[in-house]
């Protein structure tokens, strides 16, 4: 029997990938896009906001082995920590996210990054471990939200109702 993730609307998946722990442990917002080769272990809970675009070879874990457990190198217990990816996030190719991380609204995660700590809203991060390189322009970001302009799963512009509750 195939399990399905809880998806709020349009979802495009470009090639094979795997979600472990679906359907109850993962929620995916509208207008989401996954590149091929993704692996998401959602047993600790994963939330992916609307308008998130995630490139190829994405790896996300919300569980880890208990290396402080009753066996070496680890026992059979899993430590679960939810991963939250906010709305309007762009994640580049070959990014890895560890358990317990929150990626803030509008953030950009550069190709090959290993995200080990929370990412602030509108931050552009990169590296191993990922660090803040700069921030998106808040005024520009808020204008696009007010105008309801979003990139669709095909890369084309998608117009949605604008929001006036920003800025």
Where are the language model's segments positioned?
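Flexible, glycine/small-residue-enriched loop-and-beta-strand segment within the central core
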Residues: 15-28, 33-101, 136-137, 142
């Amino acid at each position: 029997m195939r399990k399905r993730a809880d998806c709020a609307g349009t979802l495009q998946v470009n090639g094979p990938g795997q979600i472990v722990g679906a359907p109850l442990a993962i929620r995916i917002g509208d207008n989401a896009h996954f590149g091929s080769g993704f692996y998401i272990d959602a047993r600790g809970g994963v939330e992916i906001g609307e308008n998130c675009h995630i490139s190829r070879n994405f790896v996300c874990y919300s569980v880890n082995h208990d290396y402080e457990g009753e066996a070496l190198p680890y026992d059979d217990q899993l430590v679960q920590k939810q991963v939250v990816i906010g709305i309007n996030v762009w994640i580049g190719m070959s990014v890895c996210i560890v358990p317990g991380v929150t990626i803030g609204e509008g953030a950009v995660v550069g190709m090959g990054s290993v995200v080990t700590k929370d990412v602030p809203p509108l931050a552009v991060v990169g590296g191993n471990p990922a660090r803040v390189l700069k921030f998106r322009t808040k005024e520009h970001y808020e204008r696009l939200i007010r105008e309801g302009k979003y990139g669709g799963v095909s890369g084309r512009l998608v117009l949605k109702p604008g929001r006036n509750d920003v800025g």
